[in-house]
């Protein structure tokens, strides 16, 4: 553990179009090699697709999708007496958000649509409805935690 003072969390400024901090954070998660303008174009393109195809408010779809994908519990490895146990632990709110965004990004990348904006739009729409790759990942993590409930007394 470092002995110096704790470094404060950086504040993320809201995105210019919607004024939403979560959208800005998601753009940062999506960004590669510091190319924020490309990430913005992808996210806003996906939001336009959601607006035109679904006729729903894209910001609402995004927040519902994010809330659906957020994990409540996950497993962590804990070594006890020469054996590794997968111990279920509750996920803290900041990590919930980070995992949800990461899973949405990865699920969108794996889709087969032509552009990343189309893939992201499809993934966000499906996640908002409780389907899709990101939801599958969340359910898988929850299943792992449920299966290893017996080891929950090995709390960290």
UniProtKB/Swiss-Prot annotation:
PROSITE patterns: RIBOSOMAL_S7 (PS00052). GO terms for cellular component: small ribosomal subunit. InterPro entries: Ribosomal_uS7, Ribosomal_uS7_bac/org-type, Ribosomal_uS7_CS, Ribosomal_uS7_dom, Ribosomal_uS7_dom_sf. One of its GO terms (molecular function) is tRNA binding. Gene3D superfamilies: Ribosomal protein S7 domain. GO terms for biological process: translation. The keyword Ribonucleoprotein applies. Coiled coil: none annotated. SUPFAM superfamilies: Ribosomal protein S7. Keywords: Ribonucleoprotein, Ribosomal protein, RNA-binding, rRNA-binding, tRNA-binding. Belongs to the universal ribosomal protein uS7 family. Part of the 30S ribosomal subunit. Contacts proteins S9 and S11. NCBIfam families: rpsG_bact. One of the primary rRNA binding proteins, it binds directly to 16S rRNA where it nucleates assembly of the head domain of the 30S subunit. Is located at the subunit interface close to the decoding center, probably blocks exit of the E-site tRNA. This is Small ribosomal subunit protein uS7. The gene is rpsG.
């Amino acid at each position: 553990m470092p002995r110096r003072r704790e470094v404060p969390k950086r504040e993320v400024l809201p995105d210019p179009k919607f004024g939403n901090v979560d959208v800005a954070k998601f753009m940062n998660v999506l960004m590669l090699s510091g190319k924020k303008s490309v990430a913005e174009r992808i996210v806003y393109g996906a939001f336009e697709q959601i607006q035109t195809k679904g006729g729903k408010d894209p910001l609402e779809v995004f927040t519902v999708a994010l809330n659906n994908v957020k994990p409540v519990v996950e497993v962590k490895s804990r070594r006890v007496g020469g054996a590794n146990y997968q111990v279920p632990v509750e996920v803290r709110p900041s990590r919930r958000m980070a995992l949800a965004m990461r899973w949405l990004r990865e699920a969108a990348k794996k889709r087969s649509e032509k552009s990343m904006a189309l893939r992201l739009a499809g993934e966000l729409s499906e996640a908002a409805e409780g389907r899709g790759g990101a939801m599958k990942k969340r359910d898988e993590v929850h299943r792992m935690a449920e299966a290893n409930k017996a080891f929950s007394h090995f709390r960290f």
